[in-house]
Regions:
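Basic nucleic-acid-binding interfaces
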Residues: 1-132
Length: 132
């Protein structure tokens, strides 16, 4: 496993992000998903984020990515949702017929940390530190 680093730290931070279309409307197809993925990659460069995996269903996307410890996740996610919403509606006008208001994405999102050792292994390791 290769760790990432910067001037003051060594890290390996993987995140699993799930973004849902407003009202769970069935709007995603392969073309729109590829378009949204390209936007994610372009914007992520400014936030020290690297895309690892992307997949979609008709009403949501799953995104696995790596980030630096100083990355402002909420700021990045909101910037992505705002930009992608605007550009998807512009370049895929058929989407407007399926959504009642201006927003493309649901207001909420699911962000999970992932990778590394299972939680039970880490918990046991921490519990046993005082025994050494």
């Amino acid at each position: 496993m290769k760790l990432d680093s910067n001037n003051h730290s060594v890290f390996l931070l993987y995140y699993h992000l799930v973004l849902v279309v407003k009202y769970r409307r069935n709007v995603f197809d392969d073309d729109m998903s590829d378009y949204a993925k390209d936007m994610f990659v372009r914007l992520s460069e400014s936030y020290n984020i690297t895309l690892v995996e992307w997949n979609h269903d008709v009403d949501h996307v799953h995104i696995l990515f790596k980030a630096h410890p100083n990355t402002e996740m909420t700021k990045f996610i909101n910037a992505y949702k705002s930009a992608s919403s605007r550009l998807i509606k512009r370049d895929f006008p058929q989407v407007k017929k399926k959504l009642w208001k201006e927003m493309f994405w649901s207001r909420s999102f699911c962000l999970l940390t992932t990778g590394g050792s299972p939680i039970d292994v880490v918990k046991t390791y921490i519990e046993n530190q005082s025994e050494k």
